[in-house]
Amino acid sequence: MLKSLFPNVDWDIVEFVGFDMDGTLYDEFNFIIQVYRPIAKRIALSTKSTEQEIYNQLLLRWMEKGSSYNKIFDEILIRHNVVESERETTINECLRIFRKHTPMLTLSDRVSFFLNYVQNKYGLFLITDGGVQLQKAKFHSLGLSSWFEEQNVGFTGLYGSEYSKPSPLITKNIKILEEVFNPKQVVFFGDREVDKKFAEVLGFQFVQTYCLQKEG
């Protein structure tokens, strides 16, 4: 199955499989539509627009730019002529809402099946960037502890920005990677260019995929 789905990987030598989380194991839009609702409500208080109008604008901009883009809230406020001092206050409150949000997420049947399959064949690990409180909440909401042991999960936000991908530093905190003697034994799945660069730095094989869709 794996050779058919991801033919660019040399599966004959793979012993360890790693994953990014957001966008790789689940559709991140499912999180965004949740967290942007209270954020839209807060931004609407600073504008003359309705909560629904702001909500739609936020979602459309996220679809255009993605989560790596950090100017979405600022752009919406500027579009609505909110003065700089109020923009700063509003953005800080929006970021607080974002970071403290309790997500309600589920894995697709496809991803659950895939994880069950590879769990029986390889050692698994996960590495995710972002604020540690929120990333842990996503991890638990998705039920990922069924496949990833705590010692093989790297929350880079726990250690500081210098540990974020593409930095290889976080791998020192992944227990199972102590067993690797050839980096080509490892394949890493991710959805972003930063995941690809991370794998390249370490010499890992890499699959760029969204929600574990087939290559090509």
Regions found by a protein language model. Give the residues of each.
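Active-site neighborhood of HAD-like aspartate-dependent phosphohydrolases
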Residues: L2-I54
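Glycine-rich phosphate-binding loop signature in dinucleotide/nucleotide-binding domains
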Residues: V9-D12, N120-Y122, L177-Q185
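A metal-dependent, Asp-based hydrolase signature
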Residues: S49, L59-I97
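Alpha-helical tetratricopeptide repeat
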Residues: R87, F139, G190-E193
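Substrate-recognition element of Asp-dependent hydrolases with the DxDx(T/V) motif
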Residues: T89-T106, V111-L142, V153-T156
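Substrate-recognition "cap/lid" segment bordering the active-site pocket of phosphatases
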Residues: G131-V187, K197
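Acidic, Mg2+-coordinating phosphoryl-transfer loop and its flanking beta/alpha structural elements
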Residues: P183-G216
